[in-house]
């Protein structure tokens, strides 16, 4: 049995179960007019694009009260990318949304979660020009960790976000931000945007 690479597992069309069940291509949905138009959030979108323009640590954490439209902003970015109405450095990018719950739910044991995680992140890094959106980012803390292990989703994601191999946009509430993110200096490297 030959171990496949992440890119081979997902393939060029990303049709494999590993990637299609856990990732949603928001840019593709935008091209198919299946996303609601973003209204009145142009300042927040510009702020996000400014952070994504950085060469390293080009990551955004949107913090705001529940229901203020954090997900709508990333969908607005996907629509702008689909229309090619973005700065040169974001052209030909794709915005992908990751379902942490789906990633966890399909894992029967701890090692399988790590394998799925590495496959998904590895495929995004290999594909290049990808922006990963993680909604309810506070769920990263502790997700997939074993009883005697501190290795969870957040710790596995840190190398990708600190090296700049992957652009990440995450969202959370103020309450969860103070509880989860302020205590973790490595996760605080994600640039914060108020929504």
Residue ranges, per PLM feature:
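Single conserved hydrophobic/aromatic residue that forms the stacking wall/gate
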Residues: 1-14, 18, 193-194
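N-terminal pre-P-loop "Q-motif" helix
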Residues: 36-48
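Walker A/P-loop
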Residues: 50-57, 61-90
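Loop/turn-to-beta-strand initiation segments
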Residues: 58, 94, 127-132, 163-169
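AAA+/P-loop NTPase substrate/partner-engagement loops
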Residues: 83-109
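Short glycine-rich substrate-engagement loop in P-loop NTPases that contacts/grips substrate
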Residues: 100-124
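A short beta-strand-to-loop transition that corresponds to the Sensor-1 phosphate-sensing loop
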Residues: 136-137, 170-176
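Short regulatory helix/loop adjacent to the ATP-binding pocket of P-loop NTPases
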Residues: 145-147, 175-189
